[in-house]
Every structure is written in C-alpha cells, then in structure tokens.
Amino acid sequence: MDTNFKFTRARLMTSAATGLAMFLAGTNFAYAQEADEADAVVAVPADSAAEKTEGDKDAVLDTVVVSGFRQSIANSIATKRTNTSIVEAISAEDIGKLPDNSIAESLARLPGLTAQRLRGRAQVISVRGLGPDFTTALLNGREQVTAGDNRGVEFDQYPSELLSQVLVYKSPDAALMGQGLAGTADLRTVRPLDHGERTVSVSARYEYADIGALNPGSDDTGYRVTGTYIDQFAHDTLGIMLAFADQSSPTQAERWDSWGYPTTGANNDLLLGGAKPYVESRNLERTAFAGTLQYEPTPAFRTSIDVLQSNFKDAGNLRGIEIPLAWSGSSLRPGYETSDGFVTAGIFDNVQGVVRNDYRGRDADVLSAGWNVQYDFNDKWTVEGDLSLSRVKRDDVDLEIYAGTGSGFGNGVSDTLAFMRTGDGSFVFGSQLDYTDTTLFGLTDPQGWGQIGYIKRPKTDDELHALRLSLTRNFDSNFISSVEFGANYTEREKTKASQEAFVRLANPGTDNFQLIPAEYLLANTSLDFIGIPGQLSFDPFRLLNSGLLVQDSNGNNPDVLLKAWQVNEDVLTLYAMANIDTAVDGIPVRGNVGVQYVETDQSSSGPANNAVGVTISDGVKYSEVLPSMNLSMEIADKTFVRFAAARTLARARLDQIAASGGLPGVDTTVALRLLASGGSVDPSDSRSIVLNGSGGNPRLRPYIANGIDLSFEKYFGSSSGYVSAAAFWKGFDTFVDPSSSAIIDYSSILSSLTLPPGAESIPNIQLGSVSGPANFHNGSLRGLEFAASIPADMFVDGPLGGFGVFSSISFTESEVTPDDQTTPQAIEGLSETVGNVTLYYEWAGFEARVSNRFRSDFLGEVTGFGAGRELRNIKGDSVVDAQIGYTFHDGALDGLAVQLQANNLTDEEFVTYLNDDPRQVKDYQRYGTTYLLGVSYKF
C-alpha cells in the first residue's frame, strides 16, 4: 500500500473540506470530558441556569435549553472546550441512548478516528492512522482486556445502551493509566449521585435485515431491549444504578472469497485460482448487566463499586460451493477473454466443486469490576485507592463439512463452468450440474484433501488485576493548582489454544462416499448472487453428532501447536503530575506536566511445533520514562490554542510476543569451531550463533513514540458551534518489523536439543536467533485534522434554527522503514484520508439526521486460513446511516420517544485485495441495509 502522503493534495482537499464542513457539518457524537465528571459542562434547563451565581458562570459556560441529540452535541462541545488535553468523546442523548447502535460506529464519527467493519458492523477503531492494537480501552478509568487474539479492543462486546459517555484521549497526561500510543478510549457508565435524580428508562427495538434470510432456518429479524434504574437514598449520600441490555441481531451476507490469482498464457494474465462463495447467516445474541453503587456519607469520604458483565454469542451457518479452478486439475479452455492483464471470462472443464455446509460461532464472557475509595484529609490533601478486575473468556468453534460427487479429483461427475468477472471484482458462473441433487452429491472428499471436513475450537482467556494508589495536594496558587503522584500495578495473563480434528466418515467403505439421509437435509440454499441457482443444505452439527461421522484429532500438527501460547505481563507505573492554572500576559493558561516511570516484566511460554511435549519459554524486563505535557491557552474570547507533547508506548502484539515456535536447528560447524577455539556465542555476531529457530519473540520491546500535537479551536454562537484545526506528529524510537530476526534465550529447551559433545559448556550457547518479529528504530507519522460544527440557530430563529451540520476530515501519512529495508512499511489501520459529514434537524420533539463516514484504503487485520489472524489490504468505504424520531415532552405521553433507524443505507460492501492490486479481490462481502424501529420511555 502506498503510504506516502502528498501534502499538496492534502492542502487542496483541506480547503474543500473546510468549506464543506462550514456548510454541511453536524455531529451525532459528543466530544470531551475530563476524568472528573463534576467538571463536565452540560446543557441544563433554563431555570437551573438562572439560579447560578456570577461565580458559577465559568462552570456553566453558555447553557442553553436543548434536549436529545442537540443536548448530546452541546454537552460534548462544552467539555471539549474546558478540557486541558486534546480529546474527543461521545455523550448519551439520554439515559440508555448513545447516538448510534454501537460504540464503534459513534467513535468512527469523531475527528481523526475511523472503524473497521466485521459482518457489517463497526467493531474496532483506528486513531490517527494507527490500528486497533495501538489504542487501549478503559472502563470507568480502569484498563480492560480484550476478546480478540491481540490487544485491539472489540467494542461490540460493550452494549452502547449501558454507557453514558466514551472519552478518547488523543494526548495523554501522566495520571492516565493504561494509555495507548495512538489514543485511549475511556468507556463510562452513569454516576448515580452525580445524576442527581431518580430515573427509570426502558426501550425496545425491532430489527430487520433487508437482504433477507439467506440460509434455511435463519432469521432476518431481531430485537434489542434495555432498561435502566437510577436512584438516590439516605439524603443523597447513597446512589445506585442498575442497567440491563439484551439483543438478538441477525447478520446476513453474500460473501465472495478468492483463493488467489496465478498467471497464464504468454502475457502472464492474472487468472482466478479458485473461489469460496458463500451466503452467511449469523445471529448476535448479547445479554449484559451493569451496576454502580456510590456512597458519600460525608463530604470528605467517597466510595463506589462498578460491575459490568456481558455474555456475547455470535454464531451461524455459511453455505456455498468451493470452486477449485486454475490451482486444481481443472483446465481452462482456449478462447478466454482478457482485459488489462486479467482473464475476465472463459470456461473451465473438469471442475469438481466442494459443496460446503459450515458453522462458525463465538461465545465470549466479559466481566469488569472495580472498587474506588477517596478520602480528603483536609482541603489540601486527598488519598485515593482503586482495585479492579477485567476478564474475558472466549470459546470459538469453526466446523466445515463437505459434499461432492466422488472422493478425490477425477472421481465422480465433474462440471463445466463458465465464468465472468463482474465490475466489483467478484465473479459469476454458469454451471452444468445441479448442486441440489441429493442423489448425486454426498458426504465425501471431492479434492482428495484427506478429510470429509474439519473442526477447530480456538479458546482464549485474558485476565488483568490492577491496584492503584494516589495522593493529591491542592494549592492556593496562581500557577500550580494541584500535584498528584501515585503508583499503579497490573498483572495480566492471556492464553490461547486450539483443539482441532479431521472429520471423516465412520464407515467410508471402498469409495469414501455416503449419500446424506433425508432426515438431515434442509431446504436448498440459493446462490443466485454467483449465478448458481442453489445447493443442497444440511445442519452440519446435527450430522456431526449423528454417528455417520467421526473426529480424528490433529493436535500434534505443527500448525496447530503454534496456535497455543501464554503471555504474562506485570507492569508497575509510578507517576507524578502537576496541574497548571495561571495566566501569562493576561492569557489564561491551563494544563498539566508530568512523568510516568513504567517497569514491565514480560514473559511467554508455548509449545515447540516440531517436538511434541517440549515447551519454549523466555521473557524480558524493561523500563521506560514517559514525560507528558498539555497546555490550553485562551488567546481570545472562546478561542483556544492547545499544545501537547508526550512520549508514549504500545506493547507489541501478543501473538508476536508468544514463545511458541520451532525447536531451533543446531549449527554443528559453528559449535565445533567455538569448542576448538574456546570461544563463546556473541549475540551481536551472527557467525557465532549456534541455535537458529523461528516463531514469536518473547523479548520484543514495545513501540515507543515521541508525539507533538497542536490544535486551534474557535467556539461561537450557541453551545454547539465551533471550528478546529489540528496538526500532529509522532516519531517512532522503536517499531516492530513482523518479518525479521532477533536473539532469544533457549535455556528452557536446551536439554531437548542434540548438541555436539561438550557444546553445552560453550558460554552463552543458549542465546540463539529466531526468525520472526524484531524491533527497529526508524519511522514517523504526521497528519492534519479539520472539524466544524455549525448550528443553524446561529443565523436564523424558529423552526429553521433546528438544522445543524458537522463535518471533519483528516489526512495522515507515515514513513516507517525497517533497518534492513529501503521500502517503507505500511502501518496497520492507516487510511490516508478519513472523514465524516452529518446533517441533523431537531425541533419541538422531532429529530432527523443522516450521516456519512468514509475512509480510504488501508492495511487491516482479518481472519485468515486456519482461523489465524493476518494483515490484508482493505478497500476504503463510505457508510451512510440515517434516523428519524419524535419525543413527547408533555401530556399523557410525556417521556415517550419513537425512532426509526437505517444502517448502511447505501449497502456499502466490504472488500479486501491481494498484492497491493485492487483488481485481485480476495474478499467481497455484501450485507444490505439494517432497519431498526424502536420505542423508549423515561419517567
């Protein structure tokens, strides 16, 4: 992927984007809030504002009478304005109602942020061009583990209905624990005492996928129900919040997956090697609870307990025909058509397709709990303690079962298949066979793969314990307002393993073929989207448990062994931070300056994939000093310049740290030479290395970056008007090359190796090389961000004043080149251009809005062969959502709201491609539009 950004083009696009933002910009998200919600500025009723004294004006900041979506905007912009850091955030429009159906969708509308979709829904985010692994997640300020294989947060684990705010720090401060290199997303639930009144809110939504139910027995409808109860007791010293969210959401998709593209003919034209087109029907079922207990018996003592528990199930069937073409025994007829070096149409003979009935599922349990205690010794000193747990247990299953006309290529009836490439890069076919014929197709091994099917059961456990202690000293000073210092200690353990087995016929007979009994058959599945009328269908799990099939373990396969690992991280963070509140030449200046000292003990263990029963283990200890500074200067009325500088880190991907790999080979020649000369292994001299292996690198150091941010913000008009421009730069002191080599310690498996006699006495012989990820020290990232929020009530009164627009656009470039290479390396998650536009209207209870978020091509992580994770080029997309609703504010229906939403209104596809060539489409997935009709009631 070309990551060289052209700032000439950027300036042109910026000019256009700024003009567009001034005219067509609006937001359905909220911006920033500081760590203490008491400092947040929110829109309040006019009577509350009138009661404020002159001394309260600085805290109120242009309160206006708004509600719903506009209240969300006003709250956000007010807190962005008062924050000392460079931040973005989302605020709930009302209890249990964030602006979008998912957290990730709302985050993707923030300036400089974007999302990657999975099965049609936004799942993980990138912040300022850096992928999901560079952004950490907190829940109420506490670090969270992840359901994925690595560090990237899958935000669909957290129901948006249970959250009141999501704050994204683009520039950290020293008191922010668990901070990411790109950004830190802090998910927040309601504080019942801060909420200040009894509230009961319930909602229900009906969901419909317009693409239809593509697999027999699947659903294209679903639901979401939520409820929240907030109350205060004992003269407002005890507060409670209880929330519940349950959903059953269908996902229907037409999927095209190519094998790849070899070349053919004298001109080396690209030709489809094979394909796996499917229709996929899944159902996401999630049940979640959240609770908060706040107790403040005296003004000096405060304590709270937070708990969030979520069970997440996402499972369903994929049915399609795997079509081996150029990479099989099939033959391409002469006379095929080509265009621009690509074979676009032709006919294959002797095609033996694999009719597949697959099942894929995920079951994840999320638990987050925390206890916080604060005590004021006096008006100068405050002590705080916080104890927390974050845990995710995930179990996946991936089952595939095959049907065909005969076992092994050349046996059974073959097909003659015409093909034609479509304008979107996928293909359609014309078949001579009837793939629904239950007298022709049976359980077998059509391509001679040695199996009737395969089953994988990956399992991941991730758990983190944290303890934080801090002490704050307040000052009556015109420069330093307070100083905070403290310590944070975390222990994290993540493990992964996979149980896998071949699926074979229990009684294969002589032909390894079994017609499917009628009681296991389902209605046929249509494959019209690829030109094939249909295929036979059955329930793969019911068939697996029928006695017709058996499972044959594949646990000792080297590829399976490599999927098992354990990573442990113990991290001690000491920090100190001074908060600044002063004036310089009459200009108000607020901010902070501080430093973190981070000490990490990192270790990993995992099996050797070429020696059953042998475990490799290694690790490293390291420390880093991370200074930070944030300054906010109000250079004119409602006009701010912000400056931030920080050194940040992001620990490497867990699968890169994982110790699992092959037993190293022994270079006998080098060992004998060192024995003869009395020499020792010198890790800096490859000629003296005796042991050479491959796999992960438990000694991998983190990504380290020095960053500078500069932002200009002008606020005007009502509480929801502003424009901003920001520039940022990060220089990487340390980066990770996934395909390099490094030195690790093989002491744990030295006794399992066959060494020349006496070689174990060679000094440092245990230090050997591993081919895999390694650190290098070169790279940078920089970008520009522009945003504007323009409410129409700046210009007109009355109903027309209900219009508003928000737009943002970001341009980012990177230049990251490994030490031993000359070509820059693409950064995961980096789209050179990211933007969004939202137009909204709200007046007298009626509201409507339409939003478009877009991003250019990028390198993203997807699930690859064998359920492993791999990086792939992903085509940029442009997603349009819309919603309309009405809220009753008086009468018998006061508090009742109805809403209709449409997600992915233009049916934007998800596309990946190979070899930096957009013509070589790997995945093409179409999801259709999802509609939600809902009603909510608050009292």
What are these regions (language model features)?
Residues 104-143, 170:
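Extracytoplasmic beta-strand/coil segments of soluble accessory domains associated
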Residues 142-170, 220, 227:
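Short acidic/polar hinge/loop motifs at secondary-structure boundaries
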Residues 176, 192-199, 234-238, 300, ...:
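Short loop/turn motifs that connect adjacent beta-strands in outer-membrane beta-barrel proteins
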Residues 803, 854-861, 886-939:
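C-terminal beta-signal and adjacent terminal beta-strands/loops
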